[in-house]
Amino acid sequence: MLFPISKQALSCPHFDSCAGCSHQLFVEPPIWREVIENFKETLNPILHQGTLTGWRCRAKLAVRGTKQNPIIGLFKKGSHEALNIPFCLVHHPRINQAVTMIQNWMERHQLNPYQEHSQAGDLRYLQFVVERASGKVQIVFVLNFKDFSSPESQIWRKLLLELAQETTNAFWHSIWVNFNPHATNTIFTDKWEKVWGEPYLWESFDGVKICFQPSNFAQANLDLFEKLLKKVKSWVREKAKVVEFFAGVGTIGLSVAAKCSWIKCEEINPHSKECFYYAKQQLSSEISQKIMFYTGSADENLNLLQGADTVIVDPPRKGLSRKFIEGLTQSSVDQLIYVSCGWDSFKKNKETLISQGWNLKKLEGYSLFPGSEHIELLTLFER
């Protein structure tokens, strides 16, 4: 159910020009109509919606403009011209506050925003992440340098350390740099450095503590995602033997581990392993000894399926490969919990799974990105 907020209160002042939202917040995601139509003969899909404003705890914003007038925001619709969005309704209030602080700080120190046409300038992007329990903000500066070896980059290092001291300890969680000197639209490279602050940002999901670094994937709408996690846990059978593919830092796997006989978590991003093990250490020895972590792609780790009866997947938008589905079907697994962030790929995967003997038993939608066409699907297949 939508929260009873007036349409006027949900009308974003940036909507007409900003590319961040495809429709106003008070409008149900149009793609949900297609989901309902697709399954109306077999299922009765439920759409879960949380709060519509202030939900985004994580934001990546472009930095453009000039020394005198830095712009921190998203690109205008149909262009690569950046737009300030100081009154963004979906941002956590701390993010909007942090953006204003950084703009003023850049003006004061006459710092150079990135210029796409010339590939000049220093600061390309910013990422802001709010730790829910403390309200502190982790900030990442994506700098147009290869490292901190040049005199210009050393000026930035000095200013970032000063920035940490300019505000109270209750505001910044940590200050990080990602070095990206390449002519690319890719925001982050693999080169990270913590300049100041705490090494890990911690979140608690139904009593299970999970930690993140800026290089790790995490959902932006954590409050609603926590409800999805609880439903996943309710679907996992007692004493299940589970393999989770595309596990990230283990948010799902660690959350359901208490119900399992054992759980193996697989993730391709090598940066996830460190956070996974730190979070694992927070669990009791009785639970932590059930949990194993493997690095590599899902297709390369199909041998993990041996002896399992349950698989949990949360793949990227391209979905599951045919090789993965074939390996899954040839295994002993009889329960598949599929978290999908790509409707088009899910439709194809669903048809392939059904053709190989799987039955779709349950489907729920989670509007993790109000204002967008994006719907997260939580589904249960059995055979």
UniProtKB/Swiss-Prot annotation:
Enzyme class: transferase
Annotated binding of [4Fe-4S] cluster, by residue: C12, C18, C21, C88
GO molecular function terms noted in the UniProt entry: 4 iron, 4 sulfur cluster binding; metal ion binding; RNA methyltransferase activity
Keyword set, alphabetical order: 4Fe-4S, Iron, Iron-sulfur, Metal-binding, Methyltransferase, S-adenosyl-L-methionine, Transferase
A GO BP annotation: RNA processing
Keyword Methyltransferase: yes
Active-site residue numbers: C341 (nucleophile)
Top-rank taxon, per record: Bacteria
InterPro entries the UniProt entry points to: MeTrfase_TrmA_AS, RNA_M5U_MTase, SAM-dependent_MTases_sf, U5_MeTrfase_fam
Amino acids binding S-adenosyl-L-methionine: Q219, F246, E267, D314
UniProt EC number: 2.1.1.-
Family: Belongs to the class I-like SAM-binding methyltransferase superfamily. RNA M5U methyltransferase family.
Name of the protein in question: Uncharacterized RNA methyltransferase pc1998
Organism expressing this protein natively: Protochlamydia amoebophila (strain UWE25)
